[in-house]
Amino acid sequence: MYAVIKTGGKQYTVKEGDVLKIEMLPENVGNEIKFSEVLMLVDGDKVTCGTPFVAKATVKAEVLDHGRHKKVKIIKFRRRKHHMKQMGHRQYYSQVKITAIGK
């Protein structure tokens, strides 16, 4: 069984036991969270697509860690002016483990 969930403006395909890094959530480490925005649920040959979400379907997960991704470097040039601007960005994330997928 697997599901497609929406969180942080992105979509993720998840199965029980998966560990993934998603956009930062305001939850403490060890807390259990529920994702109610389930877009699709697949159980063997039975496929349930939501319009836009599957009714009464939830995915439960446990928050394992919070952190920051690797730095993304941004460089802006102005041609022929000997001008260069360097910047960097590190996005915050929450690492979660999928514990249950249910309807």
From Swiss-Prot:
One CC-aspect GO term: ribonucleoprotein complex
Keyword Ligase among record annotations: no
Ribonucleoprotein keyword on record: yes
A Pfam family hit: Ribosomal_L21p
Matches recorded under InterPro entries: bL21-like (IPR028909), bL21-like_sf (IPR036164), Ribosomal_bL21 (IPR001787), Ribosomal_bL21_CS (IPR018258)
Gene Ontology terms for molecular function: rRNA binding; structural constituent of ribosome
SUPFAM superfamilies: L21p-like
Domain of life: Bacteria
Keywords noted in UniProt: Ribonucleoprotein, Ribosomal protein, RNA-binding, rRNA-binding
One of the protein's GO biological processes: translation
Family, per entry: Belongs to the bacterial ribosomal protein bL21 family.
Role summary: This protein binds to 23S rRNA in the presence of protein L20.
NCBIfam families per record: L21
Quaternary structure note: Part of the 50S ribosomal subunit. Contacts protein L20.
Protein name: Large ribosomal subunit protein bL21
